Amino acid sequence: MEKNLRAPIFNIVHGSFVDGWGTRTTVFLKGCPLCCVWCCNPEGQKTTPELKFTQADCIGCGKCASVCPQGAIQWDGKLAFVDRTICNDCLACLDACPTNALDVFGMYYSVDELFRLVECDQDYFGDNGGVTIGGGEATFFPDFTLEFIHRCQQAYIHTALDTCGYILTDAGLEALAQADLVLYDIKGMDSDAHRRYTGVPNEVIRKNLLYRDSLHKDIIIRLPIIPGYTDSQSNLLETADFLASLKSVRRVDVLPVHKYGALKYEQLGKPYIIGGVRLYTPEEEQRLKSIFEQKGLNVQIGG
């Protein structure tokens, strides 16, 4: 396989206690075939670097407006404003900003560069930690992800793949099979509703989960529960029945809605669609958890 594969990455988290077993390094690739209404990582949707503007850090110097070749940055003498209908993410403004109010989501790494970064973390992985590669959607860059998994496994590093399951390539399916652990998102059982809320139907996602399950290798299911979208009683019960029929599911992570992604939407100049959605109470979260526990599943809230 080629050794000069490159992919855009928007975050690398060292010393994570989520996204799999033990202490992990989690890599977030930039680009996803889904566009979920409730996405908490909107910077992971596009496959190219994007301008990040944190207006709270802007000191109103106007230097960015003077260097923007597109005229996409307006300055009113106090603050800068980015016109996203004009901005083409050329990033010419970055060096002009003295406060890093203008920054970038995403940069390219080769497999070698990424592996050297995570290899340094081996000492704190211990017996049950390792590396998780997700996104965005890691299998959107199937050759890169597969090669990275191979490199980690050759170094005896435990690998986890975090995936939405919408995998259409042979290399992506090989990565799904090869990873020591798969964290698999299930967003809904009704395909029409799934298409409305994520942009794609769910038949491929269900098929690929059954494929991974047939290999008798570890799976953690991740369930985003969003009021008005995925929390209907019929969807929850059908999901619980489906998961209970699988043989390789080690845990189900119930992920109640949160608002941690709100700032990222502001930084990208995008509307935050679920801003008005209410949060669950702790008692409601426990009731959601019990739906899956009643089917004999090992369940936790968060993860």
Task: Tell where the protein language model's regions lie, with residue ranges.
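Extended, non-globular alpha-helical segments
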Residues: F53-I59, G106-D121
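Short glycine-enriched, charge-decorated loop/helix-capping segments at active-site entrances
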Residues: Q55, R195-P201, G269-V277
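Auxiliary Fe-S-binding modules of radical SAM enzymes
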Residues: M1-W21, I225-G303
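Iron-sulfur cluster-binding cysteine motifs and their immediate structural context
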Residues: V37-G44, K63-V82, A92-Y108
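Class I S-adenosyl-L-methionine
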Residues: P98, E119, D213, Q286-K289, ...
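Conserved AdoMet/S-adenosylmethionine-binding subsite of the radical SAM
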Residues: D112-G261, E266-Q267
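N-terminal pre-triad scaffold of radical SAM enzymes
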Residues: I9-K63, A80-D89
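Hydrophobic packing within well-folded, soluble alpha/beta domains
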Residues: C36, C58, C64, C68, ...
